[in-house]
Amino acid sequence: MELWQQMIRDSVHTTDHLVDKFGIDREEAERLNEFFQVRINPYYLGLIREKGDPIYRQCVPDIQELQDFDANDDPLMEDAMSPVPNITHRYPDRALFLTTSQCGLYCRFCTRKRKVGNSEKISMKGLEAAFNYLEQHTEIRDVILSGGDPLMLTDAMLEKILKRLRQIPHIEIIRLGSKMPCVLPQRITPKLVEMLKRYHPIYVNTHFNHPWEITEESAKACQMLADAGCPVGNQMVLMKGVNDDPHVVRDLMQKLLKIRVRPYYIYMADQTKGANHFRTSIAKGLEIIEHLRGWTSGLAVPHFVIDAPGGGGKIPLLPNYVMHWDEEKIVLRNFRHKIYTYKNVAEEQPATTVSRKKQIDRRRAIVRRLTTTTAPLPNKKVAAFAEA
């Protein structure tokens, strides 16, 4: 048994553990563990500094989890977009491939509580329908292995999956969505990274949410992945009481770059059952992006997105930097709120075969796009541009 596997076995995971370690009332502990089971491995447990701190809040159950049962247990409609077991196909050229229901740590804000922790083991035979679907859909060029956490699989099982995917010619990119570099970095071993090298290009998306999670161990894990040729990106979830502070987020993003992890996404917390006490306002997220953009390296500025309820996918949000836009110019503000004007370039005259109506329709489409993502234009300006 490898060290990381022993640490999983030694995790806090029972009602007795919750009572003894954290002083949670036994009746509450039983209800919480029944609602969504607990797993806190010894490594991550050791990062807690005091009750209620950002590490504690992410892994120790809270009675507030039981106060929003009316919330959706599948807010992103992943199951509705699952054509075969273990596959979610939402975007045109990529698919999510759920390879296990196990994780090295059960995050209290998990959006897949309905699946995570299921004790049923997944076999290669059980994944056959998923592989067949991927083979048949030649538009899929990018597959994200998720779960649970794919790095909860043994090296041998993970390699079987990677080898099978590499036999499908149209699959160009394989991504591993894993929190292990952050919550159980002992999982990243020389043997694992040597195996991953055989199946490039492989990208890793991990999930650091707070600067305290960056330790010597997690830095080493990320370095090993990067040295093995696996670019590592980070997907942070914005959470009340964890990282809803611009200074904390800037510190995290800058420290991630130092350990060769590229900030990729900041997510608004999903509207998932048992996690609404983590949610912040959208304004808080925009404030954080304002605090990053221009004030630190562009490398440290991730995309801020909402994973839209109902399966709409990731929708980016930005502070409004466009103050005015028309056919002649665009008026912008920078990160210091200073105003600048950039002259527009006249469009080339369309070919004579393009009807006047089509020209107007195209211009109207441009106006709609810009005015729904930036500052609205005055109605007269909109009309003048569209009909010009």
Q: Predicted segments — roles?
A:
Residues 1-90, 371, 377, 382-385:
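Flexible, acidic/Gly-rich N-terminal and inter-domain linker regions that tether
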Residues 31, 289-374:
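C-terminal accessory regions of radical SAM enzymes
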Residues 37-40, 83-111:
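N-terminal pre-triad scaffold of radical SAM enzymes
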Residues 44, 107, 264:
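Conserved, mostly hydrophobic/aromatic
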Residues 109, 138, 219-244, 335-388:
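Mobile, glycine- and charge-enriched loop segments
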Residues 110-122:
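Iron-sulfur (Fe-S) cluster-binding segments and ferredoxin-like electron-carrier domains
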Residues 121-129:
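Short cysteine/histidine-rich metal-coordination sites, predominantly Zn2+-binding motifs
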Residues 128-142, 151-298:
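Conserved AdoMet/S-adenosylmethionine-binding subsite of the radical SAM
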